[in-house]
């Protein structure tokens, strides 16, 4: 059907949604302010040791996760789209300057919508293959991203 919205195959997509008791401007700010992102983006006891974000289409992103044992895991990517207070889209398919990554894994789409004075937060992870999706799910997508969403909600409520 012409004009119908296209959605990825369910076998390649993971979705998490939360109703956050905070205005979407605050939830969006928690996603786009590096100092705030560092406070919630890793499931505790993991932390974020470094954040670089150029929040424009084509801008580079680097988020470094740190394990409780001190091992660091850099996550480079490129920002694809930013709509203030509505959407953030990024991918690991590219690194800085549109250089293809060695192993593209996913594109992430975060949306923020008003819902009864709160924010409907939806995080979609779109994977290149069903195997990548399964790997991400087996790594603890629902638990890890769920814990991060809870940490995001707590931070957005207090800023």
Show where each model-derived region lies.
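Hydrophobic ligand-binding cavity/cleft-lining segments
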Residues: 1-47
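Hydrophobic pocket/interface hotspot
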Residues: 27, 37, 61, 79, ...
């Amino acid at each position: 059907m012409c004009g119908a919205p296209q959605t990825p195959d369910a076998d390649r997509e993971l979705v998490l949604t939360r109703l956050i008791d905070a205005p979407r401007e605050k939830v969006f700010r928690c996603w786009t302010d590096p100092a705030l992102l560092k406070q919630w983006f890793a499931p505790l006891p993991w932390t974020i040791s470094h954040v670089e974000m150029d929040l424009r289409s084509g801008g580079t992103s680097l988020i470094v996760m740190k394990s409780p044992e001190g091992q660091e895991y850099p996550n480079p990517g490129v920002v694809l789209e930013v709509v203030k207070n509505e959407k953030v889209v990024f991918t690991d398919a590219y690194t800085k300057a549109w250089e293809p990554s060695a192993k593209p894994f996913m594109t992430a789409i975060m949306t923020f919508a008003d819902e009864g004075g709160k924010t409907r937060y939806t995080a979609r992870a779109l994977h290149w293959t069903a195997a990548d999706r399964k790997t991400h799910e087996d790594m603890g997508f629902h638990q890890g991203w769920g814990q991060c969403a809870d940490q995001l909600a707590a931070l957005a409520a207090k800023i």
